[in-house]
UniProtKB/Swiss-Prot annotation:
Residues 30-61 are annotated as: Alpha. One of its GO terms (molecular function) is metal ion binding. Transmembrane segments: none annotated. It comes from the Eukaryota. One of its GO terms (cellular component) is nucleus. A divalent metal cation 7 binds at residues 50, 57, 59-60. The modification N-acetylmethionine is found at residue 1. This is Metallothionein-2A. InterPro entries: Metalthion_dom_sf, Metalthion_dom_sf_vert, Metalthion_vert, Metalthion_vert_metal_BS. GO terms for biological process: cellular response to cadmium ion; cellular response to copper ion; cellular response to erythropoietin; cellular response to zinc ion; detoxification of copper ion; intracellular zinc ion homeostasis; negative regulation of growth. A divalent metal cation 6 binds at residues 37, 41, 44, 60. Interacts with EOLA1. It comes from Sus scrofa (Pig). Metallothioneins have a high content of cysteine residues that bind various heavy metals; these proteins are transcriptionally regulated by both heavy metals and glucocorticoids.
Length: 61
């Protein structure tokens, strides 16, 4: 179980503006949870809910 959610890892959960679910997929907003990208990365803002700042963001690869 993800300590911050009610779902099992890999399962589905709902998320608000800031994502606390690290191992779950957000279904209510149809976006995945990921680290925030550096300024200038448009991809991350479109497909993710930020859960924390990071210089390495898989959404932007």
């Amino acid at each position: 179980m993800d300590p911050n959610c009610s779902c099992a890892a890999g399962g589905s959960c709902t998320c608000a503006g800031s994502c606390k679910c690290k191992d779950c997929k957000c279904t209510s907003c149809k976006k995945s949870c990921c680290s925030c990208c550096p300024v200038g990365c448009a991809k991350c803002a479109q497909g993710c809910i930020c859960k924390g700042a990071s210089d390495k963001c898989s959404c932007c690869a």
